[in-house]
Swiss-Prot record:
Motif (DXDXT motif): 686-690
Family membership noted in the UniProt record: Belongs to the lipin family.
Record motif Nuclear localization signal, residues: 153-158
Keywords recorded for this protein, A-Z: Cytoplasm, Endoplasmic reticulum, Fatty acid metabolism, Hydrolase, Lipid metabolism, Membrane, Nucleus, Phosphoprotein, Transcription, Transcription regulation
Positions of the UniProt region annotated as Disordered: 122-216, 357-400, 417-456, 568-611
Reaction equations catalysed: a 1,2-diacyl-sn-glycero-3-phosphate + H2O = a 1,2-diacyl-sn-glycerol + phosphate
Protein name: Phosphatidate phosphatase LPIN2
Top-level taxonomic group: Eukaryota
């Protein structure tokens, strides 16, 4: 009995350790890579499938993956996605190339970019500056300290605050006040503002609420991987609303990130398979109250129910609608302190008024768009403590209409356009020069797009804001003023009564503050509406030269550039100067060419004022123009030039992918890169049921120390490899079992003979989905056909690299046939060890007997020849051998 007890205990311990190793939350793995040297000296490679487990919450710098090949670090890095997948980042070839949301990403931060913001000196300030500028300095100081451990702890404390009772929140000191500089608000007001924000945040369930990152980069990539870009600021990033008048909060999709619901195909990226199309159509979005951020600049008009819940401090979520309405222009407060102390009107709108806003005409009513003037509230007012939406302390003094920003002073305007405010949710017109120095051309959704979840809105599919006017003036040398344009603006009723206005020679179409005639604007709008694609930039430029009336050359500057330039620091003499390119905020690193072609003819608002107000140094302009509107996309493959820099040698090359985190140390994934030639011959071998005796037990028993390998297979494979053939091991196991499977192949030993080394091709999908597909569904051929076809395409198109294949099921035979393996060299083995050739199924053999015929079935590959038998059916063994002599049966009798 003691024997049995010890054996059972050993088995339990082994199984427990095995489970720890295959836990899907901690699985990390790397699929081997095949690089094929072509006849012309170029290279092609299979995808780099690398996955790290349990690394979901990392900072931007901790998402950079280092690569070592043959023990030496290489100048090549990968980036970590939301689901632990690694990918390369490459710049798009075309400036306005349209990318799917799941492919767009941000560039990999480098060491210089990571520490550049910390080493940037503070901007010199003049003695007569306003006291409110101290808040800007505090913002800078906090942004320089974003990498400290204290800031991480403060962020955790803020998360815990949302879970506490709201009464305690009113009495507790706000930890956020330590992170963000005061903007002329008293401490009592700040506490009440924090309490109001806490009650609003508490109305969302914990799993439905995703706190916006406090530190976001000025180089804003809306389709990033849920990470932060190199340069950090203290402003949260805006999300992409569904529309300008309504914001709907979708239910939590956190489960989509969990392992069993992610589908990862060969050569692709992880995609969610939990939400079906039917579920999407049947889904009714829930709405919740929100707190306005500095990126929206809209007034929030909540429903009556949400206000009652805030008064009662109830943290439950109900089906209420939160409507955002653009305010009308109003007078700006003269003093910054007065403006900072203002707040929203206390009287909420009734529910019928809110519902009418949703069904209103495109021309809003005055009652909906003209909120009452904000009044300075007394510090001890008891009504301020209840039911009032306080402004976020990240925001400026008050909401303001965008057209009124021209009258602001630079330090006041900076409060409305912080350094990170690149407006990722705004629509972008393709031929325009984007605002952010390295922003992706598509401004859609959120960081969750990389994990396969849906974006709230794809603004690249929306039409731009188009305004019609009969002001004329495109054929004149003078500029089109905004007053003149608005004076002759065409309303909907006028256009409905007389659509022939498009033939009027004075018709001017304004598209994002640029003016065009109908001949040019029509194809641009039509292309976006019909094909959901923008016209190429080259086409638009040539179209402008042909269709627009000629004018004198001038600079193309956008209105956002004007507000950006006004934010540039002033010297003591009061003159604007442009700092060096490396010290510019990300908003100042313009992606556009500062001086266009001389025949640029489209008009732009406010350009004359810019030319008069600032003189840009030519060297700086040239530096900015070379920044380019570069957008970046994910990739799993390297180019031929990148592969050449790796300095691979023929055969296996050990590669290690490592990522270092502050709390988890260094995590490594080891694999192998195999360099083959274009004329190599490859033998395909399955693992489960082919090398092992069965599919299911072959994955479990070897981990318990039990040898479950077919006898004679190691010697057969070794003999075939000595004749010059390459081996490729293809299994439908999951990528998380790569190390386990690779270790098993090295562990197989048949009286001193081991299996030859070869690339291990596994499924990049999850552990349980791969196990279910291979063992339960018994359909591993789906993955194998995709994988083997991809490997086949790496070789010359006219060549067949696969010489023979070994499997154990009809599914394997079907997959091998689909990739071009001759059926005369497809072998299957059953659990008894009987080897069957597909062409002659009645003839059963074994691995031992086939080893005796290796020289005939797998002849030695000559170095001078590309293959042993170009036509194997006419080989000396099958055709060119001496015929059997005729025998006289009478003599034998």
């Amino acid at each position: 009995m003691n024997y049995v007890g010890q054996l059972a205990g050993q088995v339990l311990v082994t199984v427990k350790e095995l489970y720890k190793g295959i836990n899907q939350a901690t699985l990390s793995g790397c699929i081997d890579v095949v690089v094929v040297r072509q006849q012309d000296g170029s290279y092609q490679c299979s995808p780099f499938h690398v996955r790290f487990g349990k690394l979901g919450v990392l900072r931007s710098k901790e998402k950079v993956i280092d690569i070592e090949i043959n023990g030496s670090a290489v100048d090549l890095h990968m980036k970590l996605g939301d689901n632990g997948e690694a990918f390369f980042v490459e710049e798009t070839e075309e400036e306005y190339e349209k990318l799917p949301a799941y492919l767009a990403t941000s560039p990999i931060p480098t060491e210089d970019q990571f520490f550049k913001h910390i080493e940037t000196p503070l901007v010199k300030s003049s003695g007569n500056e306003r006291p409110a500028q101290s808040s800007d300095v505090s913002h800078t100081l906090e942004s320089e300290a974003v990498f400290t451990q204290s800031s991480v702890k403060k962020k955790k404390r803020r998360r815990k605050k949302c879970k506490q009772d709201n009464r305690k929140e009113e009495q507790a000191a706000s930890p956020v006040a330590e992170d963000v500089g005061d903007v002329g608000v008293s401490s009592d007001d700040e506490k009440r503002a924090q309490a109001a924000r806490g009650s609003s945040n508490a109305s969302l369930k914990e799993e439905d609420y995703k706190e916006p990152s406090l530190f976001h980069s000025g180089d804003n990539y809306p389709l990033s991987d849920g990470d932060w870009s190199p340069l950090e600021t203290t402003y949260p990033q805006a999300v992409c609303p569904k529309s300008d008048s309504e914001l709907e909060v979708k239910p939590s999709e956190s489960l989509l990130r969990s392992e069993p619901h992610m589908e990862w195909t060969w050569g692709g990226f992880p995609e969610s398979t939990k939400v079906t199309k039917r579920e999407r159509y049947d889904y009714h979005p829930r709405t919740a109250t929100i707190t306005p951020s500095e990126n929206t600049h809209f007034r929030v008009i909540p429903s009556e129910d949400s206000l009652i819940r805030e008064v009662e401090k109830d943290a439950t979520v109900e089906d209420t609608t939160c409507t955002i309405v653009k305010p009308k222009p109003r007078a700006l407060c003269k003093q910054l302190s007065d403006a900072a102390s203002t707040e929203l009107p206390e009287s909420p709108l009734e529910a019928p008024q809110i519902s009418s806003l949703l069904d209103a005409d495109p021309v809003p009513s005055p009652s909906a768009e003209a909120p009452s003037e904000p009044k300075p509230a007394a510090k001890d007012s008891p009504t301020k403590k209840k039911g009032v939406h306080k402004r976020s302390q990240h925001q400026g003094p008050d909401d303001i209409y965008l057209d009124d920003l021209k009258a602001l002073e630079p330090e006041v305007a900076a409060l409305y356009f912080p350094k990170s405010d690149t407006d990722p949710g705004s629509r972008q017109w393709p031929e325009s020069d984007t605002f952010s120095g390295s922003q992706s051309p598509q401004s859609v959704g959120s960081a969750a797009a990389d994990s396969g979840t849906e974006c709230l809105s794809d603004s690249a599919m929306d039409l731009p804001d188009v305004t019609l006017s009969l002001c004329g003036g495109l054929s004149e040398n003078g500029e089109i003023s905004k007053e003149k344009f608005m004076e002759h603006i065409i309303t909907y009723h006028e256009f409905a009564e007389n659509p022939g206005l498009i033939d009027n020679p004075n018709l001017v179409i304004r598209i994002y503050n640029r003016y065009y005639n109908w001949a040019l604007a029509a194809p641009m709008i039509l292309s976006l509406q019909v094909f959901q694609k923008s016209l190429p930039k080259a086409t638009v430029e040539s179209w402008v030269k042909d269709k627009m009336p000629k004018k004198s050359g001038r600079w193309w500057f956008w209105r956002k550039k004007e507000s950006m330039i006004k934010q540039l620091p002033e010297t003591k003499e009061g003159k604007s100067e442009v700092p060096p390119a490396n010290d510019l905020p990300s908003n100042a690193e313009e992606p556009t060419s500062a001086r266009p072609a001389e025949n640029d003819t489209s008009s732009d608002e406010g350009s004359q004022e810019l030319e008069e107000s600032i003189k840009v140094d030519p060297i700086t302009v040239e530096t900015l123009s070379h920044c380019g509107t570069a957008s970046y996309k994910k990739s799993l493959r390297l180019s031929s030039d990148q592969i050449a820099k790796l300095k691979l040698h023929d055969g296996p090359n050990d590669v290690v992918f490592s990522i270092t985190t502050q709390y988890q140390g260094t995590c490594r994934c080891a694999g192998t890169i195999y360099l083959w030639n274009w004329n190599d011959k490859v033998i395909i071998s399955d693992i489960d049921g082919t090398i092992t005796k069965s599919d299911a037990l072959g994955q479990i028993l070897p981990q318990l120390g039990k040898d479950w390998t077919h006898q004679g297979i190691a010697r057969l494979y070794h003999s075939i490899n000595e004749n010059g053939y390459k081996f490729l091991y293809c299994s439908a196991r999951a990528i998380g079992m790569a190390d386990m499977t690779r270790g098993y192949l090295h562990w197989v030993n048949d009286k001193g003979t081991i299996l030859p080394r070869g690339p291990l091709m596994l499924s990049p999908s999850s552990l349980f989905s791969a196990f279910h597909r291979e063992v339960i569904e018994k359909k591993p051929e789906k993955f194998k056909i995709e994988c083997l076809n991809d490997i086949k395409n790496l070789f010359a198109p006219s060549r067949q690299p696969f010489y023979a294949a070994f499997g154990n099921r009809p599914n394997d035979v079907y997959a091998y046939t689909q990739v071009g393996v001759p059926d005369c060299r497809i072998f299957t083995v059953n659990p008894k060890g009987e080897l069957i050739q597909e062409r002659t199924k009645g003839n059963k053999s074994s691995y031992h007997r086939l080893s005796e015929l290796v020289e005939h079935v797998f002849p030695l590959l000559s170095k001078e020849q590309n293959s042993a038998f170009p036509c194997p059916e006419f080989s000396s063994f099958c055709y060119w051998r001496d015929p059997i002599p005729d025998l006289d049966l009478d003599d034998l009798a």
